[in-house]
């Protein structure tokens, strides 16, 4: 029996690769890239060459904020997921310049990666900063924050693991809040229906700066997986 078609939560916006980004994708991929297998889970200890707390960053954009976090946090390993090739190339260049050995990058559908290729429980933190808001109501099913995706995260996060979200779309912020508050497995670290007080504990991102220039308000949410309900 064929599997039901997965709803896409992203749009591939290829854009134009600079020569530097193209060279990075070709020359730095063996150092930082993750060739996700068609089947089976990734050996994270083998991938990073050690056992350490792990952070999954979904949709890292140009990667500058991700590299900054990984550089400031050498005791944890960072796995970034992004499908926009120019952003991936830029991230690889930044990672090389920073001399990182605790960052790896994959260019696959993040939902499929979590569902099929990550062992559980293996993640200390999952962070999703400024995902596609899919503002039209008929597209809300494409938003990555859905009850079914929380089911996957609850299986992959370690007990007490964190889910950190950020958006500059007020409607999506309320959607995130409603979805997570309805899930008893997750606890809001700032109190019921509370956003993180500014400034949030993360670097500013390219998409965040763009939203601020448009006059958008940024909302951060941090939830923890209750230890007694971990998958």
UniProtKB/Swiss-Prot annotation:
This protein's pathway:
tRNA modification; N(7)-methylguanine-tRNA biosynthesis
> Would the keyword S-adenosyl-L-methionine be found if you checked this record's keyword annotation?
yes
- Renumbered residue ranges of the record's region Disordered: 194-214
Record key words, sorted: Methyltransferase, S-adenosyl-L-methionine, Transferase, tRNA processing
> What superkingdom heads the lineage?
Bacteria
Q: Which residues form the active site?
A: 132
Ligand binding (substrate): 136, 168, 205-208
Quick check: keyword DNA damage in the entry?
no
* EC number per UniProt: 2.1.1.33
Q: Where are the transmembrane segments?
A: none
Pfam families noted in UniProt: Methyltransf_4 (PF02390)
Q: Catalysed reaction(s)? A: guanosine(46) in tRNA + S-adenosyl-L-methionine = N(7)-methylguanosine(46) in tRNA + S-adenosyl-L-homocysteine
The UniProt annotation places S-adenosyl-L-methionine binding at 57, 82, 109, 132
Instruction: Quote the InterPro entries the UniProt record gives.
Output: SAM-dependent_MTases_sf, tRNA_(Gua-N-7)_MeTrfase_Trmb, tRNA_methyltr_TrmB_bact
Listed under GO cellular component are: tRNA methyltransferase complex
Name a GO molecular-function annotation: tRNA (guanine(46)-N7)-methyltransferase activity
Function, as annotated, reads: Catalyzes the formation of N(7)-methylguanine at position 46 (m7G46) in tRNA.
| Protein family per UniProt | Belongs to the class I-like SAM-binding methyltransferase superfamily. TrmB family.
Indicate what this protein is called per its UniProt record. tRNA (guanine-N(7)-)-methyltransferase
Q: Which gene encodes it?
A: trmB
């Amino acid at each position: 029996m064929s599997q039901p078609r997965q709803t896409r939560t992203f749009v591939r916006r290829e854009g134009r690769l600079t020569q530097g980004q193209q060279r990075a994708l070709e020359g730095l991929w063996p150092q930082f890239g993750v060739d996700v297998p068609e089947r089976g889970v990734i050996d994270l200890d083998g991938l990073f060459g050690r056992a350490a707390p792990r952070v999954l960053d979904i949709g890292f954009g140009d990667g500058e904020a991700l590299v900054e976090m990984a550089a400031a946090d050498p005791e944890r390993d960072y796995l970034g997921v992004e499908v926009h090739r120019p952003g991936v190339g830029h991230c690889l260049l930044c990672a090389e310049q920073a001399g990182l050995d605790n960052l790896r990058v994959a260019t696959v559908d993040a939902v499929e990666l979590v569902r099929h290729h990550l062992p559980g429980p293996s993640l200390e933190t999952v962070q999703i900063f400024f995902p596609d808001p899919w503002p039209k109501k008929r597209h809300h099913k494409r938003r990555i924050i859905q009850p079914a995706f929380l089911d996957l995260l609850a299986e992959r996060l370690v007990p007490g693991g964190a889910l950190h979200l950020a958006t500059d779309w007020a409607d999506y912020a309320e959607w995130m809040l409603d979805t997570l508050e309805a899930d008893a497995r997750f606890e809001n670290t700032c109190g019921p229906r509370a956003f993180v007080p500014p400034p949030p504990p993360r670097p500013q991102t390219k998409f965040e700066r763009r939203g601020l220039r448009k006059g958008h308000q940024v909302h951060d949410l941090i939830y923890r997986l209750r230890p007694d309900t971990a998958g």
